[in-house]
Amino acid sequence: MAALSKSIPHNCYEIGHTWHPSCRVSFLQITWGALEESLRIYAPLYLIAAVLRKRKLEYYLYKLLPEILQSASFLTANGALYITFFCILRKILGKFYSWTPGFGAALPASYVAILIERKSRRGLLTIYMANLATETLFRMGVARGTITTLRNGEVLLFCITAAMYMFFFRCKDGLKGFTFSALRFIVGKEEIPTHSYSPETAYAKVEQKREKHKGTPRAMSIIALVRTLVDSVCKHGPRHRCCKHYEDNCISYCIKGFIRMFSVGYLIQCCLRIPSAFRHLFTEPSRLLSLFYNKENFQLGAFLGSFVSIYKGTSCFLRWIRNLDDELHAIVAGFLAGVSMMFYKSTTISMYLASKLVETMYFKGIEAGKVPYFPQADTIIYSISTAICFHAAVMEVQNLRPSYWKFLLRLTKGRFALMNRKALDVFGTGASREFHNFIPRLDPRYTVVTPELPIDFS
């Protein structure tokens, strides 16, 4: 870590807004670029979300535009206020210290910006930025040799997280809202202890299906025969009395779970690749084949499918071994199911789910009266996390997640890469390492230190 007392005499033009010597002009340029990009991000995002949630006409008329503008204002303020505090700190302190170009300027900017955003979105933004900041700090520690990497560490973290999530899922009132609904969709409602699916209702549903198929024409008889054959195979097999999958034996229950979630994962990855595939439809038509026969499609499918099948298989196995259904089974089953991430390794997914788990446990502690409640916790955590990420973007971009760095470049129209990081190398973080010794051309009339590449006025 660079010494906090070390400083350089350069002004804000020489280090920050090297494209223009005026702080006001630079502020306006950053603000306009950030606003333009923010509207491009949030307008389609909110519109798609409104369509998927089947919002009524009143929402589109009175709420959609204000919400888009509010979120766009938040993101714009985050970028514009950063350059503002960057210049203010330099004028107040008279020089740059190791912490001022990044963390010092970003902390107050992020705090003010998050107050503009709607309260309902602050929690999600906080989780995302806390996750990103944790990953950034980890990379910084590895780069400095203070932290040693663990092979398949993201898989181990996911195993622990999955074990805890599945335990809460099995417990009464353990999870609520979207998290509970998502896990119920993934592993099925048969794994919920309070599930009211009785053998009688299962039998009644099967009888209804049979009645329905009786009136089908002859053309459908082959399909009906295949269905009947599959149903008979699924039903006639080992199933423990504690298992609630009444229409399947334990083996077919696991196989069906794998096939279902494999299909979901495969289709999700295909949908994510559709925009890039159609962009090259006329120039490279062969890319359409890669939409369906891509390695990542099968990897995500294998990850989700094996997670469900391992979880269900382990749960059934433990019910057979212990002759009872227990919430503690979910810890073992969830941990073993987490090994499925070997098919689709992702530090981002592991860190995000772990962050959400910490948030869930924190609020459970508040409900139990064992953990104090901090009213401004989300605002403070967001501010500190964003400041850490901005500091990395300025002082050591090699330790920042590449996708977030690209986002910052989009938000500032590429101006974030124009900082004079060569002058920041004195702090020992390798600030210019990824910029191929880039040195900005500066007007010597507005500099404190003689520039290496002065603008030639001749």
Curated annotation (Swiss-Prot):
Principal localisation: mitochondrion
Places the protein is found: Mitochondrion membrane; Peroxisome membrane
Coiled coil: none
Transmembrane segments: 68-88, 96-116, 149-169, 298-318, 331-351, 377-397
Sorted UniProt keywords: Membrane, Mitochondrion, Peroxisome, Transmembrane, Transmembrane helix
InterPro entries (alphabetical): Tmem135, TMEM135_N
GO biological process, any: long-chain fatty acid biosynthetic process
Pfam families: Tim17, TMEM135_C_rich
Molecular function via GO: lipid transporter activity
Gene Ontology CC, one term: mitochondrial membrane
Knockout mutant characteristics: Age-dependent pathologies, characterized by accelerated aging in the retina similar to macular degeneration of the retina. Retina show higher sensitivity to oxidative stress. Defects are caused by impaired balance between mitochondrial fusion and fission.
Family: Belongs to the TMEM135 family.
Function: Involved in mitochondrial metabolism by regulating the balance between mitochondrial fusion and fission. May act as a regulator of mitochondrial fission that promotes DNM1L-dependent fission through activation of DNM1L. May be involved in peroxisome organization.
Protein name: Transmembrane protein 135
